[in-house]
Amino acid sequence: MDVYEFYWRDQIKGYQLIGGLPERRKNPARVTQESVINLAKELIGDHVDANDIFFIKITKDENTGKILRPDPVYRPLKEYLRDRRRCPRMYMDLPLEYRVGYGSYARGGIVVDASETGFLIYSPDGIPVGTELKIAVLFPKEYELEMLEVSAEIIRKTFVAKEEKGYQYGLKFTQILEEDCRKLRELLQGSSQI
């Protein structure tokens, strides 16, 4: 089992262990810079700077907990937190309309973020993972509203509690026309990266 151990670099004592976390892809909770810094503040105090936090990757035996392979190099925290996706996600917050299959009625939702390969959307409706959706996203372009249409499959579903309860869905595009792909790229260029 791979584990990341986080260390705080003390000018006098050297590297001091803060704690360990499982590999990111196996960890359902999002590890953020703030969460690691808050953990460090609990243990060390308020004088913690993100530039003084480092991590190493170690391999542990799952049964005994014995360290099998420690990584000898301490790497900066920002390297652990960098986005490793092939296509980076961009924050959107745009209205969308979707249909489940061809004959169903339209339902509403919000695009939370997007990349060239998919969307993260919010919807109050419960839809099973694996469902194919036909999606139309509305966005402003100069003084008009444009529409971007894609087909996508739900690959992840998470319950969220906002003002009204609902779900976040991770969607992977299954079909997108070249014109809509161009619109998406333009939209992504004007958005801020997560």
Describe the residue ranges of each PLM region:
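N-terminal acidic leader/helix
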Residues: 1-28
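Short, mixed-charge low-complexity intrinsically disordered segments
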Residues: 37-79
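Short solvent-exposed strand/turn elements
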Residues: 42-44, 127, 165-186
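N-terminal helix initiation/capping motif
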Residues: 65-66, 70-114, 185-194
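Short strand-loop-strand
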Residues: 94-134, 168-170
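Short, conserved beta-turn/loop elements at beta-strand boundaries and strand-helix junctions
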Residues: 101, 116, 157-163
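A residue-level detector for short acidic-glycine micro-motifs
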Residues: 113, 154-156, 175
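Short, Lys/Arg- and Gly-enriched loop/turn segments at beta-strand edges
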Residues: 141-149
